[in-house]
Structure formats: structure tokens, C-alpha cells
Amino acid sequence: MGKRLISQNRGRGTPKYRSPSHKRKGEVKYRSYDEMEKVGKVLGTVIDVLHDPGRSAPVAKVRFANGEERLVLIPEGISVGEQIECGISAEIKPGNVLPLGEIPEGIPVYNIETIPGDGGKLVRAGGCYAHVVAHDIGKTIVKLPSGYAKVLNPACRATIGVVAGGGRKEKPFVKAGKKHHSLSAKAVAWPKVRGVAMNAVDHPYGGGRHQHLGKPSSVSRNTSPGRKVGHIASRRTGRK
């Protein structure tokens, strides 16, 4: 009897395939959307900048005027001791948080909410930013890094600027060990071995005197889990 496929082991949910979220610094999101932000602004001071394992951007610990502390994504150019503003009357300056409806067109933004008050869901990776493209009655159009223009509620909040940590991909890993330690902070099994390079006991495409599939690559949607590899329920394969 053959061994279980990687996809089957992943479904079991062993520690190897689970994200080590216990190593993270904490929840990174905006403060609650209260009346102070809806009618004015709240001041906060950056008291520390932290490395968060598994995240591509640094996070800052911010202490607000009411004593509340939050972990937030910081933009390029912000350092310890600087002040940020959150609210409808905040200044248009990197690091400040405003509703999309109050941000002028063409300004780069990140950590965008999809529902007002959800804490920020879009554009959170290091070096990323979106652009406010247009405003209309009851909606704001934002161009995401993918090029997709998304229509959002003008009350959704966003941060002015570009997420810190850009250019991280320009430096090569050089050593396999560095890559291993980097991906061990995420739910990524690395290195990724091809099925044809495995033994017959490990994968349906494994074994043989040379690397080849040895069977059709298309499989049914209802195929048993141990054989469900390749093109699953494909309408067509190969070049068009």
C-alpha cells in the first residue's frame, strides 16, 4: 500500500503544515471605529518598531492618547517617536489613517478595510500600495497592486503611504538553510518535490527507469484522494 500524498497529510493538519501563529507579536489591525474617529481624530505615538515572524513588513507598537496600545503596519519613513493621526480630520501624511472618502485621488494607501470597522484586509504585504482612483456618491474606487479596480464604501479606512519592507526580494537567499528558516515561519512545506521524482510508493507518478507520468494526467472530480493528482476535472490540457 502506498503512502499518503502531501495534500492528504496537509488535510490531517499536523504541526508541519500548520501556521506557527503562536510566534507572532499579536493582532495587527486598526483601533475600533468610534465616535472620536468619526467626528475628529485620535493622536498616537510610535513607541517601538518590531519584526513579526511570518510577516513581510515590520509592525509598530502605537500608544494612543487615551492609553490604548495597538500593533499597526507602518509606512516607509516612519520611526520611533513620531506621531500618527487616526480620524476623519487627520492630515494627509504617511502613516495617518483616514476614511477612503476623505483621501484625495492619486494618493497611495494600504491596509484597506473592505467593511467599515473590520480593521484592514487589503494591501498589507511589505512594499505594497494601492491608489485612490475616483470618488462617487456612496462609493470610492481603489486600484489594487494587481491592477484590479475595487469599489469600496467611502467609510472604509486606509493608511496613507507605502508599506515598509519593500525591496526585500532583491536580496538573494544564497543558501538553502536561509530559505528553510524563512519559510518555517509560514505554513509552507519546503522544498517542493515533483511527483515524478518520487518513488512509486510515495506518489502515483513516481517510480520507473526514467521520470514520466506513466498514466493520464487528467483525473475525475470524484477520484479517490490518494490518486487525485495532476489535472483535476480538466476540460482540456496542453497547448491551445
From Swiss-Prot:
Renumbered residue ranges of the record's region Disordered: 1-26, 206-240
GO molecular function, one term: structural constituent of ribosome
Pfam hit, one: Ribosomal_L2_C
Subunit structure: Part of the 50S ribosomal subunit. Forms a bridge to the 30S subunit in the 70S ribosome.
Keyword Ribosomal protein: yes
Function: One of the primary rRNA binding proteins. Required for association of the 30S and 50S subunits to form the 70S ribosome, for tRNA binding and peptide bond formation. It has been suggested to have peptidyltransferase activity; this is somewhat controversial. Makes several contacts with the 16S rRNA in the 70S ribosome.
InterPro entries per record: NA-bd_OB-fold, Rib_uL2_dom2, Ribosomal_uL2, Ribosomal_uL2_arc_euk, Ribosomal_uL2_C, Ribosomal_uL2_CS, Ribosomal_uL2_dom3, Ribosomal_uL2_RNA-bd_dom
Protein name: Large ribosomal subunit protein uL2
Ranges of Polar residues composition bias in the record: 1-11
PANTHER family per UniProt: LARGE RIBOSOMAL SUBUNIT PROTEIN UL2 (PTHR13691:SF16), RIBOSOMAL PROTEIN L2 (PTHR13691)
Native species: Methanococcus vannielii (strain ATCC 35089 / DSM 1224 / JCM 13029 / OCM 148 / SB)
Superkingdom of the organism of origin: Archaea
Keywords associated with the record: Ribonucleoprotein, Ribosomal protein, RNA-binding, rRNA-binding
Bias (Basic residues) ranges: 13-26, 228-240
Protein family membership: Belongs to the universal ribosomal protein uL2 family.
BP term (GO), one: cytoplasmic translation
HAMAP family: Ribosomal_uL2_A (MF_01320_A)
Gene responsible for this protein: rpl2
